[in-house]
Amino acid sequence: VALPEVYGYLLSRCGRRALAEDLTAETFLAAVEAVRRPDPPELTTAWLIGVARRKLVDHWRRAAREERGLHAIEGGLSPTDDPWDERLDALVAREVLEDLGPHHQAALTLRYLDGLPVPQVAELLGRTVHATEALLVRARAAFRQTYADHVKEGRDD
């Protein structure tokens, strides 16, 4: 049931059928591996889309790393190509997002990272627009609290 939604999600973001097919396969392979764990997650469409998004991000990271490597070999990297603070903030934000529950992760990812409007997020999550708006309010609050906890832990170390 979720296969067309996961594939459509990936295809709409990467624009390449072969890549979308590969990432869809990787997503469902990750789902099979997750089910084999002692405490498996609830396999919902939202959870699968979250996994698919991470697979796509991983693909883009690998491609960017390869491109940077080629650029470095050609001698084109400058010190300004390494915005450390931005990367650190992004890393903390990613860790915080991964600490949230699957519904909060999916809602925040679709709305803010993928830039989808609330009605489309609602459709993908199988919720009403009103229920999705309420979910986003709770998800943002959970993100803020978890982010504050991460920042506090970082200072305590």
Feature locations, PLM:
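DNA-recognition helix of helix-turn-helix
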Residues: 53, 57, 125-149
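Short, small-hydrophobic-rich alpha-helical interface motif
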Residues: 6, 10, 20-31, 51, ...
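Arg/Lys-rich amphipathic alpha helix in sigma70-family domain 2
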Residues: 36-40, 49-71, 86, 149-150
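Sigma70-family region 2
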Residues: 15-17, 25-44, 62-64
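Short, Lys/Arg-enriched C-terminal cap helix and immediately downstream tail that follows
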Residues: 10, 61, 100, 140-157
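Helix-turn-helix DNA-binding module
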Residues: 98, 102-106, 114-134
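Amphipathic, Lys/Arg- and hydrophobic-enriched alpha-helical face
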Residues: 1-17, 32-34, 97, 149
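Internal acidic/polar
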Residues: 58, 66-95, 117
